[in-house]
Design a protein with these regions (language model features):
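Active-site hotspot residues in diverse enzymes, especially metal/ion-binding acidic/histidine motifs
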Residues: 1-204
Length: 204
């Protein structure tokens, strides 16, 4: 099975459809943080769990596509352990629950949901990209699917109609940096995520 080549505008359309079905006001009302955790658990009926995924926080999230088991790090015992997991579980590293990492937490949740929406048929087993079975190299497949997941995550957390509405309301008298900070606070995303979103739409 090959990786689908999905145009950016097609991914934007997927994101709009998800938000429209959940709550149309997220696209047309007062700009606000998208309740991504609630969308994951109620609209998609997925299980959201928080654990220490690895000793070093290099992997912040994993999406489980089949019933099975995963290896997680136990900070108390200081060793890895195996736990049973069900298909439709999203695992998030609990160290992201620090209030200072709110933007990173929300983006990671959206990113993992994006894998479920876009890549469910591409995965087998309970791993992350390593479990992918395809006809391209693992490095190439990893890059493609991660970019696609990032794009959908951005679309979900920073809907384009709302981003444009905010941008044109706030831009007068503000530097790009000030604009990025204010808009990141409104949507509860990181400054980096907001900067990338605005640049990708040629707004800054």
């Amino acid at each position: 099975m090959s990786i689908p080549q999905i145009r950016t505008e097609a991914i934007e359309a997927v994101g709009r459809k998800i938000l429209m079905e959940y709550d149309p006001s997220l696209l047309s009302g007062q700009p606000c943080p998208v309740p991504i955790e609630t969308i994951i658990e109620t609209k998609f009926d997925l299980i959201l769990e928080f654990h220490t995924l690895r000793k070093n926080p290099k992997i912040l999230g994993e999406t489980i596509f089949d019933d099975g088991a995963v290896v997680l790090y136990d900070q108390i015992q200081r060793q890895y352990r195996m736990i049973a997991v069900r298909a439709g579980t999203i695992l998030i590293d609990e160290r992201l629950c620090d209030p200072s990492k709110l933007g990173r937490l929300r983006f990671t949740c959206a990113h993992e949901l994006a894998h479920w929406v876009l890549h469910k048929k591409l995965y087998s087993g309970t791993g992350d990209v390593a479990a992918y079975n395809g006809n391209v190299s693992s490095d190439e497949s990893h890059g493609i699917i991660e970019r696609q997941a990032d794009t959908l995550a951005s679309t979900l957390l920073m809907p384009l109609p709302q981003i444009k509405k905010c941008f044109y309301r706030l831009r007068i008298g503000r530097t790009d940096e000030q604009l990025i900070v204010e808009m990141a606070n409104i949507f509860e995303v990181s400054k980096q995520a907001m900067q990338i979103r605005l640049k990708s739409r040629n707004l800054i």
